[in-house]
Amino acid sequence: MDQICGWIDVNGNYNSIRKWKTKFNVDYLSNGIAVCQGKAIKSPIVIILESPHVDEFDASGMPKGPAQGKTGNRFDKYFEQLINSSSVSNVIGTGSHAVVLVNSVQYQCSLGKQPLKGKNRSNCDKNWKLCFNAGGNTDLIKRLNALNPIAVINLCTASLKKDVDQQICHFSNYTCGYHPASWHWRKYRKIQ
């Protein structure tokens, strides 16, 4: 499930973020158009993450959306600062642009466990690569084409970033940065 988490308002030299407490799901129509609440999404900024983890599902197993828990909290706290110091801030036109959170693989590769480090991280990465190479990469490209983004920012974890880079680096205004979960360390607060 991909979601709009807010809007970037571009006015001159500074981009401000309007965030919502509620995120809005993106629907992909059969004609290749991405919509939110029945309206076409125009010129969004797309943030690529890896796959949904345990925090992104409710107690009954229904998806809540990308970037929940620490990742979402750090994204909310630092994204405005980082987007304003990135190369993306120089290329997006004036106006409002939706910020769309996209999991590159739509399946829970962590299998209900916290993929922090060690064996859980390794198993999660192996599962992600299996899914990505078995059609997840094609699905990601279809969703990005439907969104027709003004910019794409790859914030996948380091171990998976290269796989995603190889598939989507041809999109205009493509850049990358560190995963939001690592943004609590100042040296990792960066979007190129």
Question: Predicted segment positions?
Answer:
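Short, surface-exposed acidic-centric catalytic microdomains
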Residues: 72-119
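Glycine/proline-rich loop-helix segments at beta-alpha junctions forming the active-site rim
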Residues: 2, 108-192
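Short secondary-structure capping micro-motifs at structural edges
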Residues: 32-35, 61-63, 80-92, 138-142
